[in-house]
């Protein structure tokens, strides 16, 4: 039966339902952190549409918070005409006007774990003010802040900006040259290490921390981008002008930023690609992307255009490259894993990027590596997957993540993405979403167009609306269950929840309520049929059921072998006739023969399994076994029937096409193998036929399991390829293909990477969170 959902028994009590590309660009290497705040759940539709309109507008905005650190470095650039005058005096004005009450500079509002960031930004601002002999009062207050907070310099619980251990001590040296008296203990280990450090390679991104020791001419030659910057970093580009004052393109780059922001600069620029990638990813994670389909398509079209052009905003940055690959591939764009080939070797990766690589780059590479769609050619992704997985697992073992959210993100990424329920993940992302979320490079920053009150409230309200719809549909499903007295056929009421959860994962679109309920009903009906042919009915009764289906419109003349068959067929007949009526209204044509043929094919093969295989009369080949059992598992019946309820008219020719056959075949193999891997020991004891027992006739159990996992992965990749890659001449709408992939996802979700069922309590909590528990709990 489909996805083997009955293997997990859940008892859930609820009053509503009764009982029961050169890597040296570290400029986007960043850590995402969140500031927790209380959730205020909107109780009505007030503002929902307005918030949606404002979110749509955010696609046209590129917003990043001011960086005190980078602005200070730009402020230190001398005029082209006089070394005694600032080139950008407006930045000095901004520094003077934006000192915080405690005497510091940095992200506003700040965060208790960002003291190192504040210390770095404050010292940079003090250097700028002291260099140009302005802001005496601000300097005094800034020195006071550094004196009182210098304990944080070597504190391991504090989040460090990238390159802090190089840049901060270097700025201390610069302060000494300017006779700026810092009350800092130079015996602090961070400072001591850096002052004794012989600078080596892989530190170009934080070259401002190396200063005069850098070969700036060589750095500009090797790393200057088309926009004139070094690594899209205003601070590093400014440092090039401070220590090597002869580059017109660097000046033009900084001028272009100040033309936009007047008197301050962000910590990276340009930010359009970064903002678009993060915004699309965030909308998907929050589960609200369906409200912004046209905006997301326009954004991804732009990213794909740049991908094809090998634009440096994507390919000079690990995070951008990996994220673009993942978002584009999962959105049906043709992208090749060849573009990630530079990252296949861990040693090479770290040799180029150095130790200043945060977990975000590794995390994004790992996410991208899970999207292999070709067993022969995607060894690039396999190699990336292997070393990134090992790296992150080691990080977890060593407790190498400073904040809880980073650790959680890595734990989720280490589970295959197709084993994670989107619904639960949407809830988790909403719960952890914060308006004051920040990320950190050499300075902490925020993205107001990605993290804001509008998106927060909109996501909550969207989740509430979906949750309310699910509760209403569950009521309908329960009434159907009771009206057809399915409990009399061995189906306990407790299966309502997990069956419906299956349907929600496969058909999540709110507007497809009929398809979702059809899917859930068919899973239960298939379970009943499976029970009858597996153990509840005799062979004569099974033959009786087949004849009743064959003579569907004249079933009364067939008669019943038993009362049990009568009750069963009566339920099956009424249910299917009801669904046929709805399907024919939606399609505007007769679909009854096609649906009945699917049922007839299924029950005949179920009988063959029972009479021929399970009795030991014949032993099927591996191919025959997988073909037959994929059908009896429901991999044709349920997805194909669901196609009629997806809001589009679909011809019988399409549903009988080779493309559909391939989708059914791969889906069925994935479902069957996952089930057999779980049940192998139990089935061996019962002397039943499984792919495990068949392979063990010629090899050991360990070898059989290994071989089966290879077959599983091959079919999963082939299925993903058929769903994601646009086949020339295909007439099958994308939503029809998606049903097959999501069906396999549900099986992976249940079997959890083939190492054990989700325990009942975990599934109960999952159902509770998705269907009932308010977000503020």
Swiss-Prot record:
It is found in: Plastid, Chloroplast. Mg(2+) 1 binds at residues 530, 534. A motif (DDXXD motif) lies at residues 530-534. It holds the Pfam family Terpene_synth. Keywords: Chloroplast, Lyase, Magnesium, Manganese, Metal-binding, Plastid, Transit peptide. It comes from the Eukaryota. Mg(2+) 2 binds at residues 530, 534. Its EC number is 4.2.3.50, 4.2.3.53, 4.2.3.54. Its cofactor is Mg(2+); Mn(2+). It is an enzyme of class 4 (lyase). It catalyses: (2Z,6Z)-farnesyl diphosphate = (+)-alpha-santalene + diphosphate; (2Z,6Z)-farnesyl diphosphate = (+)-endo-beta-bergamotene + diphosphate; (2Z,6Z)-farnesyl diphosphate = (1S,5S,6S)-alpha-bergamotene + diphosphate. SUPFAM superfamilies: Terpenoid cyclases/Protein prenyltransferases, Terpenoid synthases. One of its GO terms (molecular function) is endo-alpha-bergamotene synthase activity. Residues 1-36 form a transit peptide. GO terms for cellular component: chloroplast. InterPro entries: Isoprenoid_synthase_dom_sf (IPR008949), Terpene_synth_N (IPR001906), Terpene_synth_N_sf (IPR036965), Terpene_synthase-like (IPR050148), Terpene_synthase_metal-bd (IPR005630), Terpenoid_cyclase/PrenylTrfase (IPR008930). (2Z,6Z)-farnesyl diphosphate cyclizing enzyme. Produces (+)-alpha-santalene, (+)-endo-beta-bergamotene, (-)-endo-alpha-bergamotene, and at lower amounts, (-)exo-alpha-bergamotene and (+)-epi-beta-santalene. Not able to use geranyl diphosphate, E,E-farnesyl diphosphate or E,E,E-geranylgeranyl diphosphate as substrates, but able to use Neryl diphosphate to make the monoterpene terpineol. PANTHER family: CIS-ABIENOL SYNTHASE, CHLOROPLASTIC (PTHR31739:SF33), ENT-COPALYL DIPHOSPHATE SYNTHASE, CHLOROPLASTIC (PTHR31739). Belongs to the terpene synthase family. Tpse subfamily. This is Santalene and bergamotene synthase, chloroplastic.
